[in-house]
């Protein structure tokens, strides 16, 4: 029986160590500008060109071109996207194109993250608080495991999260357990290896990253894949290795060998831990003495108490809160050295593709500065050792050195990409489908909403979708509320909407649950929505970041995948950016029309199947999705977050006593347990929004209120 017949396809990635070639699976062949673009890019990579730029219009098949380049150069590849939503879309597409190869997804695993901070002006310290998405954590582990498995056919789709520090790849690799049937190893020795790989023991139902022992049988729930293993011992010998269903525990088959990768990216050896603790204590003594020499007794005492407590926690349980601030010691790095990151897990000859580079590159540049300003305060006021500054994202020049060969992909490349490519710019302006760029019309802003609703109604009657882009998140939410009252099936997405919720909303738009999607800058780059025939740009004449030539061109491109594509710019004057966008769009329309005429092509709509994104299956039924729309529409995931959050303004952090709070909010005294739970949930949503808006004092206040209410919940009777 074939190996792939025994176990799920995804598991095959992790115990096959054979070097495989990329196998592109597509019913289409490159056409239009694609063959020429693919050849030029492949030749550039083979000739060692450090940077190239693919200038491809929306709908010209840039993703398919990228896939063909990857298949031909046959190297491990990092595809970098500037937000999680587009990264998820690319991940889904590459999983389809390369079903037999290892395609991985690596983004930030925080659903909510409030960083540690100190505000000197008000003498307020805010402790770190976070919520981790377990599914994304699993996908991150799967990424590092695949890269260290020895396979060459690995594609990683990532956000800028790949710039942040993770564990030393040498330590991670040393903690991999390479098990073979017949190995001479005692059960207890094997259990110690699991603990060193950060798996934890349980006697209950297996959760991810746990193991259970019954006699000579050890069951393990892998941390990086939805699979369980059963290792059976006969004395001091491994008798059998089975892959099991993680819940039902039925067998997928037996295996002669299996590699078990660590349960956490931040893994280290006991020897390195002891060395790190010793160095932390040395630096602590030196920095405390420096504070005292400067007459800063408060800072000296604060630093001594905090670090001493952390050291004791590390000695006793192996970790502490904020252990990432000591990563330099555990990694064995010198002061000032860059942290290890995902790029260190790739082989030396990997290829980097930066999607929507005109946005992604500036984002990469900005990562280091924002992190440094926050850490500097923590160090200066005795909350952290100097080493905390070295727990940081990569600087831009460090990123450039770690990515020897890069392809920038954008419909509107910026000056940096063009200059670094030194004239190696590959144009892809022909759409194989024959689709033309959308028509652009300019409409006065007076009565723009009434006019827009009429246009939406026309598209809805044809079964088409509409995108509306506003200047602010608040405008998006208020317009969403108004459309809901007008019985328009609508939703919105922006930075306050959780990653998985964004993906669901986009899928629901394609499915017909919504007819309209409202957003801000998330509607500009890369969204692949062939059902969208109308893009409405409100306040198009308000010059700025969201209404410059590049942004407008990208927004116009969202309607370029539909046969009836049209863009309406609502404005009272035509700005220079608007005119450039209109002229460039018209130029591309003429090129496409000439190509269609020469090749006798009739434009045809893109038919793109809805598929699973990041483990979530797309619905296939038609009618039930429409039936569920009204209830879902009234409270989309982020709407209640923002409504709740807007009720609070930033204020100084206080820690009121329970009695003070009861006087301030007497309604709580009359709540039953169910009502209190709902109130706590609303506060939690407000806390998440406050943290995302960098209002850390407000988020900390809400966090403490939630803790107090949870403690008092038990005393409230029904």
PLM region descriptions:
Residues 15-611, 615-618:
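ASCE RecA-like P-loop NTPase motor cores
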Residues 4-6, 10-20, 599-685, 689, ...:
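Acidic, low-complexity intrinsically disordered tails
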């Amino acid at each position: 029986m074939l190996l792939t017949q025994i176990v799920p396809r995804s598991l095959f990635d992790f115990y096959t160590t054979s070097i495989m070639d990329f196998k592109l699976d597509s019913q289409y062949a490159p056409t239009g500008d694609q063959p020429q673009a693919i050849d030029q890019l492949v030749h550039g990579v083979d000739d060692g060109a450090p940077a190239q730029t693919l200038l491809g219009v929306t709908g010209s098949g840039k993703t398919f071109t990228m896939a063909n380049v990857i298949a031909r150069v046959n190297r491990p590849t990092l595809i970098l996207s500037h937000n999680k939503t587009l990264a998820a879309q690319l991940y889904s597409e590459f999983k389809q194109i390369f079903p037999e190869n290892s395609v991985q997804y690596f983004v930030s695993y925080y659903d909510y993250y409030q960083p540690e901070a100190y505000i000197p002006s008000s003498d307020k310290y805010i402790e770190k608080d976070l919520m981790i998405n377990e599914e994304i954590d699993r996908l991150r582990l799967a990424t590092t495991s695949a890269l260290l498995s020895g396979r060459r056919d690995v594609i990683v789709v990532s956000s800028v999260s790949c710039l942040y520090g993770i564990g030393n790849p040498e330590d991670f690799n040393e903690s991999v357990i390479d098990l073979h049937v017949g190995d001479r190893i005692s059960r207890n020795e094997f259990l110690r290896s699991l603990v060193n790989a950060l798996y934890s023991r349980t006697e209950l139902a297996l959760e991810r990253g746990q193991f259970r022992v019954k006699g000579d049988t050890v069951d393990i729930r892998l941390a990086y894949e939805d699979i369980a293993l059963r290792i059976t011992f006969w004395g001091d010998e491994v008798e059998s290795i089975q892959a099991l269903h993680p819940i039902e525990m039925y067998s997928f088959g037996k295996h002669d060998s299996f590699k078990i990768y660590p349960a956490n990216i931040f893994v280290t050896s006991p020897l390195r831990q002891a060395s790190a603790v010793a160095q932390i204590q040395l630096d602590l003594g030196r920095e405390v003495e420096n504070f005292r020499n400067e007459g800063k007794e408060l800072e000296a005492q604060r630093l001594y108490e905090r670090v001493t407590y952390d050291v004791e926690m590390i000695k006793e349980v192996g970790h502490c809160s904020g252990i990432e601030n000591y990563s330099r010691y555990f990694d064995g790095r010198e002061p000032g050295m860059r942290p290890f990151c995902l790029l260190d897990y790739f082989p030396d000859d990997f290829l980097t593709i930066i999607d929507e580079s005109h946005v992604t590159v500036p984002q990469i540049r900005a990562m280091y500065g924002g992190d440094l300003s926050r850490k500097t305060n923590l160090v200066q006021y005795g909350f952290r050792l100097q080493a905390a500054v070295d727990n940081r994202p990569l600087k831009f020049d460090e990123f450039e050195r770690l990515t020897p060969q890069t392809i920038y992909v954008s419909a509107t490349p910026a000056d940096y990409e063009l200059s670094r490519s030194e004239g190696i710019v590959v144009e892809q302006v022909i759409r194989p489908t024959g689709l033309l760029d959308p028509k652009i019309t300019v409409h006065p802003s007076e009565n723009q909403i009434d006019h827009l609703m009429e246009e939406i109604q026309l598209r809805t009657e044809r079964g088409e979708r509409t995108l509306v882009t506003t200047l602010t998140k608040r405008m998006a939410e208020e317009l969403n509320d108004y459309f809901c009252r007008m019985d328009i099936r609508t939703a919105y997405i922006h930075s306050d909407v959780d990653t998985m919720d964004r993906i669901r909303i986009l899928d629901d738009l394609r499915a017909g649950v919504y007819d309209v999607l409202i957003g801000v800058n998330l509607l500009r780059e890369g969204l692949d929505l062939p059902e969208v025939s109308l893009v409405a740009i409100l306040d198009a004449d308000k010059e700025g970041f969201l209404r410059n030539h590049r942004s407008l061109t990208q927004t116009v491109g969202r309607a370029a995948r539909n046969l009836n594509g049209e863009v309406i710019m609502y404005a009272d004057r035509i700005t220079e950016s608007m005119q450039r966008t209109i002229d460039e769009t018209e130029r591309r329309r003429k090129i496409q029309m000439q190509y269609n005429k020469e090749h006798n092509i009739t434009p045809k709509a893109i038919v793109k199947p809805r598929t699973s994104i990041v483990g979530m299956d797309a619905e296939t039924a038609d009618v039930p999705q429409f039936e569920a729309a009204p209830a879902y529409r009234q409270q989309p995931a982020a709407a209640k977050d923002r409504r709740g959050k807007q009720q609070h303004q930033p204020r100084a952090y206080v820690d009121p006593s329970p009695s003070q709070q009861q006087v301030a909010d007497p309604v709580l005294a009359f709540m039953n347990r169910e009502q209190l739970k709902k109130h706590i949930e609303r506060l939690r949503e407000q806390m998440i929004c406050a943290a995302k808006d960098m209002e850390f004092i407000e988020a900390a206040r809400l966090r403490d209120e939630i803790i107090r209410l949870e403690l008092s919940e038990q005393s409230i009777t029904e």
